[in-house]
Amino acid sequence: MSMPRRPVIRIQVRYSGRVQGVGFRATCAWIAQTVVDSADPITGWVRNEADGDVTLEAQGSPAAVEGFLKEVGERLARNIVSAVRAGMAVVEGERGFGIRR
């Protein structure tokens, strides 16, 4: 008998403020790779935008994604002026969390 699949969500967040040139993307990747519970991993990516914003997409269980985004918001609060969230389609087979250029 196969195990039931856990629910998976994907959230995109566009951050504005002083979010480029301050280690924002590296901190997001570090949180995803080391702070989040390895039994409930986060996948996705983070990248700089031409207008000075940073876009992040995070995928995983609802609890993992919300915990990850909370950690990002707390650790980088001094840099974030606004964060606009949107639900996205789940990317099947995605592995890892990376920095896109």
Label each residue range with its predicted role:
Residues 1-101:
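Intrinsically disordered, low-complexity, mixed-charge
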